[in-house]
Amino acid sequence: MFTLGTALSNQIDANWQTYVMIIVYFIILLIIGFYGYRQATGNLSEFMLGGRSIGPYITALSAGASDMSGWMIMGLPGSVYSTGLSAIWITIGLTLGAYINYFVVAPRLRVFTEIAGDAITLPDFFKNRLDDKKNIIKIISGLIIVVFFTLYTHSGFVSGGKLFESAFGLNYHAGLLIVAIIVIFYTFFGGYLAVSITDFFQGVIMLIAMVMVPIVALLKLNGWDTFHDIAQMKPTNLDLFRGTTVLGIVSLFSWGLGYFGQPHIIVRFMSIKSHKLLPKARRLGISWMAVGLLGAIGVGLTGISFISERHIKSEDPETLFIVMSQILFHPLVGGFLLAAILAAIMSTISSQLLVTSSSLTEDFYKLIRGSDKASSHQKEFVLIGRLSVLLVAIVAITIAWHPNDTILNLVGNAWAGFGAAFSPLVLYSLYWKDLTRAGAISGMVAGAVVVIVWISWIKPLATINAFFGMYEIIPGFIISVLITYIVSKLTKKPDDYVIENLNKVKHIVKE
């Protein structure tokens, strides 16, 4: 009998072809990293944003791959397997959020970040948009990014280490270091261009995997009658409303609000060649996301019948994809599918490393170094950017060396933290002419604080009243919106040229 959640190497003989496939995958990543390094010009914007020269298809898949992470391949199938189709509500919320993001945020952000000081980070954009000469908003938002993304990144290293431990019986720390060395190499040397190309490559692998596994599982089981079998085994798992409430569904939908403020996702919009290419990126990106999420749901559902038929003991449902990929397929294909999991994990790690590095370099080092003759110090800034990648990675690896549940729980709420702190501010910055520095700073801080307070002290009260169990992005987002508006109305309006920039952006986007 197989057991979900224990080392597969103890249950399935690892074939040399599986290892070959993983090694080939790593070699391809290293080659892409070297290519990115060869293309480098020594310019910070080029290292951090690819010189704003990225095409629509790489933009689309790199955004999707860095967004979905291992959650799409491991988390969602495990959730569907355990709780059923009620997990679909979060996928609807995420897809709607991503779709709206392409329409509402992407075009204006791409144009605005270039015409207003050529901002290469989100904090830099806030600073330029609000004419914050004291750099207060830049420092606060940069600090939020550095702290939360360092913690966020460590969870990816933990996932990578556990994958090698589970699939190959390798020591956790050895697996962690293997993932770290590869991802640091291509991010350190290749910068944004290498990260974007590898994310595109990894996005393709992830999509193929999410289509292959549920289809082959259906063919190996009982075809479409498998769903009838599932209904017999776990009838409640096909119920969209099982175990949910109106508040629960709203909470799941609200995940979509976070998209407008996720730095590692919206930076993709800043790097595309032209805002006119965004419709192409949107069509591919949302299609990729929809197919991938449907595939993940398919893995979870077919897994119910598969696990039962094969008499596999379930301890950790999130290893469902790993088990199915290794039992259903030839070792060579199984290795490819394990590479898909690594792709999901590493694409997010690299994106978060680069965003954090960008913030350390652009939002802190350049402030300390001074802006005088900045153009003559580009190679120095690129070097600092590379060293920042290494520094953040070392800190994240150190935290991941001894996984701590408390930290992992905090990382699980980082989406809400970024969404509450940055989403309202991004929307206000792009659409509201009366936004002021004081309003922006107050709303951003209030959103982040509400999320932390809700997680720490209010959410535990859900045992008394279900209302307190709502997803923390909802109160955080609402408070941030209100505080930003009220404080902006009570403080001095921005200068005319700030409003002129906003009008200029509107005009360019409409062209």
Curated annotation (Swiss-Prot):
PANTHER family recorded = SODIUM/PROLINE SYMPORTER-RELATED (PTHR48086), SODIUM_PROLINE SYMPORTER (PTHR48086:SF3)
Q: How does it sit in the membrane?
A: Multi-pass membrane protein
Q: What catalytic activity is recorded?
A: L-proline(in) + Na(+)(in) = L-proline(out) + Na(+)(out)
Q: Name one GO molecular function term.
A: proline:sodium symporter activity
Q: Kindly state a single biological-process term from the GO annotations of this entry.
A: proline transport
Describe the family membership recorded for this protein in Swiss-Prot or TrEMBL: Belongs to the sodium:solute symporter (SSF) (TC 2.A.21) family.
Q: Which PROSITE patterns match?
A: NA_SOLUT_SYMP_3
Q: Gene Ontology terms, cellular component aspect?
A: plasma membrane
Keyword Repeat belongs to the record: no
Classification via InterPro entries: Na/Glc_symporter_sf, Na/Pro_symporter, Na/solute_symporter, Sodium:Solute_Symporter
Q: What is this protein called?
A: Sodium/proline symporter
From which source organism is this entry? Answer: Staphylococcus epidermidis (strain ATCC 12228 / FDA PCI 1200)
